[in-house]
Amino acid sequence: MIVETTNTLVAAAASLFSVTFSPEVRTAYVSRGKVIDDRPIQVNSLRADMKLGAEAQFGRIGAWHWGYNALTPRVNCAEDQFAAEFDWGAYYHYDLELADGWSLGNEIMPDWIIMPSADPVFEWRVSQSLKNPYVVPFWLMRRDQPSSRNCYFNVGLMKPISFRTASADWLKPLVITPMAMVEFGNSSLMTARYGRQESGGAVPTGLQAIDFELRADYAVTENFGVYVSILQFDLLNPKARRQSHKPNCRDITVFAVGVKLSF
């Protein structure tokens, strides 16, 4: 009886925790409205969280890590010969149930960005997404603290297309997600990203870029999946375009392939 009770408690505790690890390879790196690196990179993403309540009725808390390493020497856009970045964060996530099939996802995260060639950066990330059976709108804001005051914002739409009801069994684990997004930055971020104008003035706050992505996820098993994606990034801000002298640093197509491990 004691053994059964112990096993039940252990199983209940284990069900509160989950870990997702996703290594991938990309042909380039785009971040906050700029082509950071136009050479192949290897990316690792790790997310570990714990439910607050058996059904996560009080949300979830967790830790997050994202990092990349360049796979080849510098090409056009990268400032460093061999670039790398390591992000670490802790987050709180809460899904507010609105109706059957509708929920508002809310997340806040303090994040530390570490690059070997620069001082560490601390930022806040706040995001929301309205999950529903149709098209999912989402937005994200990133604000550096305390000194630079760079502020980044994006808003977009995505549509996960599931094949669970397909007659062919091999199609059922497939999910295809098209996404469209526009990116904005305040003057501080825009100037830091692209440099000052030829007149010496700062690049003003405004629209940065537009992104279109098509991603396909395939669940091989309950705990293992693979995915591929193609992203088209286009820099729209005319002042930023003038500051980005290489064509590949203004507009770029990024391919990615990776695996997803869930526990």
Model-predicted segments: where are they?
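Surface-exposed loop and membrane-interface regions of Gram-negative outer-membrane beta-barrel proteins
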Residues: A56-A118, L236-A240
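Transmembrane beta-strands of outer-membrane beta-barrel pores
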Residues: V25-S31, F58, H65-L71, Y94, ...
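Membrane-embedded beta-strand positions of outer-membrane beta-barrel proteins
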Residues: F21-P23, I61-H65, A90, N106-P110, ...
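Residues that define the transmembrane beta-barrel architecture of outer-membrane proteins
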Residues: F17, D38-A48, F82-W88, L104, ...
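Short glycine/proline- and aromatic-enriched beta-strand/turn motifs that initiate or cap beta-hairpins
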Residues: I2-V3, L9, A13-P73, A90, ...
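Short loop/turn motifs that connect adjacent beta-strands in outer-membrane beta-barrel proteins
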Residues: L9-S18, K51-G62, D80, D95-G105, ...
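Outer-membrane beta-barrel transmembrane domain signature
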Residues: S45, G53-Q57, R142-D251, G258-F263
